[in-house]
Amino acid sequence: MKFHILAVGNKMPDWVRKGYTEYCQRMPKEAELLLVEIKPEKRVGSKNTRQLLQAESERIRTVLPPGCHIVVLDETGKQATTMKLAEMMDRWMGSGQDVAFIIGGADGLHQDIKQMAHEKLALSAMTLPHGLARVLLAEQLYRAFSINRNHPYHRA
């Protein structure tokens, strides 16, 4: 099974790339972590926020794996403990369906993307930088997998 992270933004600092790569490499093939960076819409001319989000929404749809379980990351989503995320991961893996996590850009996500999601998840009630959200999500997915496999990484 694959966990796809579809993230709007393609010019991340080196620390983001290194942090994400660290946890991506730790994930076993049975729970492969794949990142797809989506080019953000340029803020030019008379484009308003709605138009920017619509353009990004279309880009997201073109790379969204067919038949996957869609989880939108949004500060208004459901907050879950790490143990709850481990339960969710166990359920997702049991379904055999790939999971796509969608992280919006500077202006968030278009309402259409939010409405097509099967779940909305919040990493925090606070707004996070998009690069940090990638690293945090990758780490939490690795931690959840470790919990489900009784790996000593999670010692809480």
Swiss-Prot record:
Location in the cell: Cytoplasm
Domain of life: Bacteria
Gene Ontology molecular-function annotations: rRNA (pseudouridine-N3-)-methyltransferase activity
Main enzyme class: transferase
Gene3D superfamilies: 3.40.1280.10
EC number(s) on file: 2.1.1.177
Gene Ontology cellular component terms for the protein in this record: cytoplasm
InterPro entries: Alpha/beta_knot_MTases, RlmH-like, tRNA_m1G_MTases_N
UniProt-annotated binding residues for S-adenosyl-L-methionine: L73, G104, L123, S124, A125, M126, T127, L128
Reactions accelerated catalytically: pseudouridine(1915) in 23S rRNA + S-adenosyl-L-methionine = N(3)-methylpseudouridine(1915) in 23S rRNA + S-adenosyl-L-homocysteine + H(+)
Keywords: Cytoplasm, Methyltransferase, rRNA processing, S-adenosyl-L-methionine, Transferase
Transferase is among the record's keywords: yes
Protein family membership: Belongs to the RNA methyltransferase RlmH family.
General function of this protein: Specifically methylates the pseudouridine at position 1915 (m3Psi1915) in 23S rRNA.
Record text on subunit structure and interactions: Homodimer.
Protein name: Ribosomal RNA large subunit methyltransferase H
Organism of this sequence: Nitrosomonas europaea (strain ATCC 19718 / CIP 103999 / KCTC 2705 / NBRC 14298)
